[in-house]
């Protein structure tokens, strides 16, 4: 490692990363490392968790392709999973000049929100029962888009900015969270991922919350106080492992990451030109006949 120095505090085990001048650009939060034995489907594993100190003026970017609209991820809660329309990548870049790859392949919670709010489903629906054509595993079908309303209350101990996290349990068509009459999360389309997070400024005391989601979703809502800490947690893993990349520029950090992960090869020239994209081919005959039509048209 040419452009960084790694220091380990023996009493606490805390690891810090500095540049050649000795300036710290990243450090673990002392005592935050966790590796707890667990099982998944009867197989032994570990819950791995690590927190890092995050200065008040730090900006964090990355983690993949999400619909939540966040640019700066400092303090935001995200669940890193792969679903249709969402691509998770446990790599982030900091304006402090470093990149961090949380080297886990399974589900990972970024800045997990562990304070859950009791939600009560209301008897009435939101009154928008309708059928829409949706892509399913059996092809395009008309599926009910009926939505349900949930209500609840929660209390926060002090004024400040809080991370609000919604988990629907499955993909949905509506992510709508209102706190004290103010929309905090508001997304609607036919391809919403199961989770969404937002930051909200709240006063100390009790707050009323409403959640609107697809009727067959099972929503869970949680919160956490935003602080100057960044946390990764993986519930089913074999070890705690992460990699750090250092500048001096964003380009050099990404270049180091690409050197490690491997460069994507260019496609051959014959693969460029007309690209056919569709939902699916329903049978072998459907696919073969489509190719025949392409050849007839010299595509």
Enumerate the predicted regions with their spans.
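Active-site mouth loops of central-metabolism enzymes
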Residues: 274-284
């Amino acid at each position: 490692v040419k452009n960084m120095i790694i220091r380990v505090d023996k009493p606490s085990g805390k690891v810090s990363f500095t540049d050649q001048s000795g300036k710290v650009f990243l450090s673990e939060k002392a005592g935050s490392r966790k590796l707890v034995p667990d099982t998944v489907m009867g197989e032994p594993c570990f819950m791995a968790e690590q927190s890092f100190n995050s200065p008040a003026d730090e900006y964090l970017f990355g983690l993949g392709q999400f619909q939540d609209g966040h640019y700066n991820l400092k303090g935001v809660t995200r669940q890193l999973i792969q679903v249709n329309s969402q691509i998770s990548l446990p790599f982030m870049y900091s304006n402090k000049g470093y990149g961090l790859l949380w080297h886990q392949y399974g589900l990972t919670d970024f800045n997990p929100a562990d304070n859950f709010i009791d939600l009560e489903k209301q008897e009435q629906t939101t009154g928008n029962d309708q059928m829409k054509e949706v892509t399913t595993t059996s092809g395009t079908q008309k599926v009910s888009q009926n939505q349900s309303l949930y209500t609840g209350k929660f209390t926060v101990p002090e004024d400040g900015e809080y991370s609000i996290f919604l988990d629907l349990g499955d993909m949905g068509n509506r992510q709508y969270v209102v706190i004290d009459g103010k929309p905090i999360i508001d997304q609607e389309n036919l391809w919403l991922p199961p989770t969404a997070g937002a930051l909200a400024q709240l006063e100390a005391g009790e707050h009323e919350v409403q959640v609107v989601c697809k009727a067959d979703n099972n929503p869970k809502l949680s919160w956490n106080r935003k602080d100057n800490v960044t946390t990764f947690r993986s519930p089913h893993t074999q070890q705690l492992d992460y990699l750090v990349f250092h500048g001096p520029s964003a380009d050099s950090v990404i270049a180091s990451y690409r050197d490690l992960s491997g460069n994507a090869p260019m496609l051959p020239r014959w693969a460029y030109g007309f690209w056919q994209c569709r939902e699916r081919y329903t049978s072998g005959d459907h696919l073969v006949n489509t190719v025949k039509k392409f050849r007839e048209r010299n595509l």
